[in-house]
């Protein structure tokens, strides 16, 4: 089995493409099923192992397969699944085989490949991806081992380096941007759309600035109310958003919607009702919650996850020593994992050798039992049994030696000498 990771992320593709390749949670299990079917319909002897990691900043497919054309097949599957032309998608896709796939998984979980260097949210997202793949019956020995090692490496990196120290989160970056637009956030009304982990982080940072009002709009009213109350705010129904948007100076949105929930027309009406007082909008969702055309309106300052990334990266340079330490740890653990993977590759060979030897043993034991049943001397039967086993067990190695070319024979002799604990002929005196 070969490991392979294909994907796109914030390094290789803009948000406009990433949102088209994203997998909503409810689509991941069916997607894994179709992916496995594609490979079983090809030359693969067994169903591939697979897991899909889909976040705001990346969509990645981790797989283990015996199909040597897996790279091309996986990229075409991703293209067809999302109805994106292969010529449009392929330039943004990375395909990482074997040790590169292992190294990438370790770096992602450790926060080295994140927009926010050292962020911890990605570990939880990877664990969710593993859980979903397990429930879909798509995980096996290879990916299970890869992800268990991945989480162990991430823990080691975070506990032995300063990779997460002094990091500037996306939430903190949103506050910094708001402070560039408004002199004081404390004078502004803030609306959060959604009630997930990212919105909660943003609410924490904005609440620290003591805004005039903090409001949450969420599809699930109870969850929105609970989040609002924890910051001394209030909740409104999501359905009221089009008619209430003009009330807010700062709007931060991050939902799991597959389509925009804030359109150009609604924002145009809000700007008009505000008499062109500026609105600061942050869209942290992928796919995006706010139609990109909104950013072209005067008096609207719209920022996406990619825009916030520039601010986040300003704080990354100071932690390069921690990055170097983390990379050293990861490289060692990659080598350890590849040793395990190499050992796994010989398991089928060993199993075949054992099966073949056992078949020979049973055949000779059957012969011996028949000889004993007809009254043959037990000592002679045992001698015949041992001779037959010896001859048949060494037939394969001796046949290989006899057929080997002169340049390969010395290597075979050395290997077999180790197997049978015999010295190499040239070492005898």
UniProtKB/Swiss-Prot annotation:
During catalysis, the active site Cys acts as a nucleophile attacking the alpha-carbonyl group of tRNA-bound glutamate with the formation of a thioester intermediate between enzyme and glutamate, and the concomitant release of tRNA(Glu). The thioester intermediate is finally reduced by direct hydride transfer from NADPH, to form the product GSA. Pfam families: GlutR_dimer, GlutR_N, Shikimate_DH. GO terms for biological process: protoporphyrinogen IX biosynthetic process from glutamate. It comes from Paraburkholderia phymatum (strain DSM 17167 / CIP 108236 / LMG 21445 / STM815). NADP(+) binds at residues 194-199. HAMAP family: Glu_tRNA_reductase. This is Glutamyl-tRNA reductase. Keywords: NADP, Oxidoreductase, Porphyrin biosynthesis. Possesses an unusual extended V-shaped dimeric structure with each monomer consisting of three distinct domains arranged along a curved 'spinal' alpha-helix. The N-terminal catalytic domain specifically recognizes the glutamate moiety of the substrate. The second domain is the NADPH-binding domain, and the third C-terminal domain is responsible for dimerization. InterPro entries: 4pyrrol_synth_GluRdtase, 4pyrrol_synth_GluRdtase_dimer, 4pyrrol_synth_GluRdtase_N, GluRdtase_CS, GluRdtase_dimer_dom_sf, GluRdtase_N_sf, NAD(P)-bd_dom_sf, Shikm_DH/Glu-tRNA_Rdtase. The lineage of its organism: Bacteria, Pseudomonadati, Pseudomonadota, Betaproteobacteria, Burkholderiales.
